[in-house]
Each structure stands twice: as C-alpha cells, then as structure tokens.
Amino acid sequence: MVAMLFYVDTLPDTGAVAVVDGDEGFHAATVRRIRPGEQLVLGDGVGRLARCVVEQAGRGGLRARVLRRWSVPPVRPPVTVVQALPKSERSELAIELATEAGADAFLAWQAARCVANWDGARVDKGLRRWRAVVRSAARQSRRARIPPVDGVLSTPMLVQRVREEVAAGAAVLVLHEEATERIVDIAAAQAGSLMLVVGPEGGIAPDELAALTDAGAVAVRLGPTVLRTSTAAAVALGAVGVLTSRWDASASDCEYCDVTRR
C-alpha cells in the first residue's frame, strides 16, 4: 500500500522529529488512525517529501521521525486551469477533480455567463474554500506540490493574461463544444507551458471567445460529447497527460513510488 501523505509547513532534517498538528494532525491521527510504528510521508507542498516513522500519536496529532528526505522535480509542461466560476454545488467538484488529474495552478474567472458571482467578501471566502479543496485533493492524490489558486479575473484581465502567456511560449486552449480544432491536433508537446480555459454552465460568450482567440488562444474540443464545467478540466488534463511528456514516467519512476526504492 502506498504510504499516506500529510503536509507540514517545514520539513525537519533527516533524523529529526516532525510534529504534525492542526487539521493535518487531526486527519492523520483521528480520521486515518495512524499509530506508532507506522510509516507515512510528509510534504511541504512545494516539492520536498520525507519518509517518516510515527513515534507518538494522540487525538489531535502525531510526532514522526524523519528517515529520509528527497525532492520531486515539477512536471513539464506545467498546466494552469482557468476555471469559470460554476454553481456552488459544482465549484468544489471542478477544482477537486482537476487537482487529482494533475493541474499545476488555478485561476478563477468571473465569466459573463457565470451564475455564481464572487464580489466583495465572497472573493476571499471563495478562494479560501478552493484552496482548502485543492490541499485536500492534493493530499488524497499524493502530490508533492499543492497547486496555487489565484483570481478572481475579469474577462479583460484574463485576455491580458492570455496575451502574456502566449508571448512567453505557452499554448492557451479554450475548451469549447463548437470548436473545429481537436485537442489532439494541437502541438501541445512543444509548448513551454499550457493553459486550459473552462467556461461556465452557460458557455463562453461569443465576444469573450473572440477576445481570447484574438489574444492568441486556440478554441479546441475534447471529443464528441459535451462535458459539464465541473468535469471538463479533468478530462482535458487526461488528454494532455497522454499528448505531452507529463505522463512519460513509468510507475517505478513516479514521485511516490520513489519512497519504496530508495
């Protein structure tokens, strides 16, 4: 069984004791019921991991001694998901699935046809919730890096961001059900980075699509079916994993299998 992962702010040196408390400690000791003698992996969320053995466990956390540390290189090319704000019941699902599928960063987008509207205090509240979902999903999928979540971008702000990304060598793909280009026909493997733009339930407005493509984005379709905004990014990330070198590593070379062979 693959060892469970929990995040800490700072990883101690090899031989030192790490204290896992707060939400992570509660999840490890109370929810997952990890006990002394068991091994787990701790991560700092930015690429460094440590194999540890638990020495003490209580209701609110545990103490574990670091056996070994290592760093995981970032996956290339990196993929940023621009997610238009879905309805509340779909919002967290979209971010959760995309994190598990490998998104490296998220940008929240207030598109014209969004039913949800984040303004004022809702911006901070929404971003905090998305970040919590991303952290949980990253832990569940054993990711060495917790994807950052930023926004909320207006359409003009997104258009400017797209223009900058394209100028820097990125491929920006707008997922659209009426696109004539297929994602498999885009030379994504040669791009320095990728950006996937996912519209809201009502779709991307024609003027928004025109502005994005004028800025250098390419409208693409994933396949013959129309996907929900909550599942589109995850499916696209799967396609990108196959079409680029992101999934080239064999099982024995994956960031997590690494702990069993060192």
From Swiss-Prot:
Keywords: Cytoplasm, Methyltransferase, rRNA processing, S-adenosyl-L-methionine, Transferase. It is found in: Cytoplasm. One of its GO terms (biological process) is rRNA base methylation. GO terms for molecular function: rRNA (uridine-N3-)-methyltransferase activity. CDD domains: RsmE-like (cd18084). One of its GO terms (cellular component) is cytoplasm. Specifically methylates the N3 position of the uracil ring of uridine 1498 (m3U1498) in 16S rRNA. Acts on the fully assembled 30S ribosomal subunit. Was identified as a high-confidence drug target. Belongs to the RNA methyltransferase RsmE family. This is Ribosomal RNA small subunit methyltransferase E. The gene is rsmE.
